[in-house]
A protein has these predicted regions:
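Short amphipathic alpha-helix that is part of the acyltransferase structural core
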Residues: 1-47, 51-58, 62-65
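Acyl-donor binding region in acyl/amide transferases
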Residues: 63-155
Length: 155
């Protein structure tokens, strides 16, 4: 199904390519998963010319609104940060997470398709606020100075 395909892509990107360390169950299933997946919506970019459904999913985002967060027991971001001020906002919330794109598809076109899908979702669900976690590749602060500076000043 679509969630399995999304989890398979996430596994390939996060664990095979970026060398994150999976749990034993994740490694055995070759899937990146958690308890939030079944409650959330999953946005997929599919290249129909690729053979096999799992291989055809080349981009993904996980999306969660208040309704899905209630089913999941909260927002994923709340497991990492205090987001009480965000949750207190009036209007519909959208948490974006677990985004990744297959290596050969990291182009402006693939990201444009993902953001077009997110925009449609935002309008469809009347989203007022968007938030989420993001990972930066690496541990050297000198190499990450530019994105960290941007987040410090504008995040």
């Amino acid at each position: 199904n679509e969630i399995d395909a999304s989890q398979a892509l996430r596994y390939r990107v996060f664990y095979d390519e970026m060398n994150a360390i999976p749990s034993r169950e994740m490694a055995a299933r070759r899937r990146d998963f958690d308890n939030f997946d079944s409650a959330c919506d999953h946005l997929l970019v599919i290249d129909s010319s690729r053979v096999g459904f799992y291989e055809s999913v080349v981009g993904t985002y996980r999306l969660s609104r208040r309704e899905t967060a209630i089913r999941a027991g909260g927002f994923y971001t709340a497991s990492e940060y205090d987001i009480g001020d965000i949750i207190a906002q009036k209007g519909e919330l959208l948490e974006l997470g677990r985004s990744c794109v297959a290596k050969d598809y990291r182009t402006g076109h693939t990201m444009a398709l993902l953001w077009r899908g997110i925009a449609a979702y935002v309008f469809s669900h009347e989203i007022a606020w968007i938030f989420g976690c993001a990972s930066l590749s690496g541990t050297n602060p000198d190499e990450l100075a530019l994105p960290l500076s941007y987040l410090h000043h504008f995040g």
